[in-house]
């Protein structure tokens, strides 16, 4: 098994992409910590994969610290962190409430920063680790009516590049996945008439995450773009 006994945290693991990544990591042998706000959802996933469920709100710094502490206490040093939890607001800029802008940025960008900040000491202590951030096609373009989402995902791209600059020489690889439109509850709520056959599957993104988490991925693989019927590796 490619991830045998690796300790992995997956945020937003209760459904969609996060759930698919958690399931695939467990199938590859990892010891997976599933985290999200919904206790029922992550408990169900953790039971399915024999993992650990730790409820956590990505806007609560103390809860994130407790997530990291619980992981190290229960399973040992952290090998892999997948920052997947996300939020979206679909309104034009002039109609977007400031609190909705703040929430999207807090979950999608500040949450990524906080999880990474508190997971890094464990990785630095053992001299190795892998951080996988889930961005989006919106991280390279500016889709209409999703300004906060696009800004946050652009931020994830820049943050990941900085992680490479700061920690690669200390044995910690940092990568970012940019999925195109994916079958998920969040997607169906925003685009209820969209044909799901035109979208990629969460399992495709999970496959990319497993690849990045293993030694098959080199430190020079910064980005993976997952598209319908095509995967492109950007070096």
Question: Where do the model's predicted regions map?
Answer:
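The beta1-alpha1 cofactor-binding region of Rossmann-like NAD(H)/NADP(H)-dependent oxidoreductases
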Residues: 56-67, 98
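Substrate-binding pocket helix/loop in short-chain dehydrogenase/reductase
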Residues: 92-93, 100-105
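Residue(s) in the substrate-gating loop at a strand-loop-helix junction
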Residues: 136
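C-terminal helical subdomain
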Residues: 169, 176-177, 184, 192-233
């Amino acid at each position: 098994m490619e991830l045998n006994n690796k300790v992995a945290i997956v945020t937003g693991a209760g459904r969609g992409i996060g759930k698919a990544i958690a399931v695939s990591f467990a199938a590859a042998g990892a010891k997976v910590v599933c985290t999200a706000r919904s206790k029922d959802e992550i408990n169900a996933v953790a039971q399915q994969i024999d993992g650990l469920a730790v409820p956590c709100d990505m806007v609560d710094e103390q809860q994130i610290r407790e997530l990291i502490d619980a992981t190290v206490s229960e399973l040992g040093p952290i090998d892999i962190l997948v920052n997947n939890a996300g939020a979206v607001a679909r309104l034009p800029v002039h109609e977007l409430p400031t609190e909705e802008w703040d929430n999207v940025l807090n979950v999608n960008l500040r949450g990524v920063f906080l999880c990474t900040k508190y997971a890094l000491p464990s990785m630095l202590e053992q001299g190795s680790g892998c951080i996988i951030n889930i961005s989006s096609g919106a991280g390279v373009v500016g889709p209409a009516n999703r300004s906060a989402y696009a800004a946050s995902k652009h931020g994830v791209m820049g943050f990941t590049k900085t992680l490479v600059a700061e920690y690669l020489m200390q044995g910690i690889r940092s990568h970012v996945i940019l999925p195109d439109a994916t079958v998920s509850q969040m997607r169906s709520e925003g685009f209820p008439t969209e044909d799901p056959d035109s979208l990629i599957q969460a399992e495709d993104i999970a496959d990319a995450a497993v690849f990045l988490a293993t030694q098959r991925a080199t430190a020079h693989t910064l980005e993976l773009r997952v598209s319908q019927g095509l995967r492109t590796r950007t070096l």
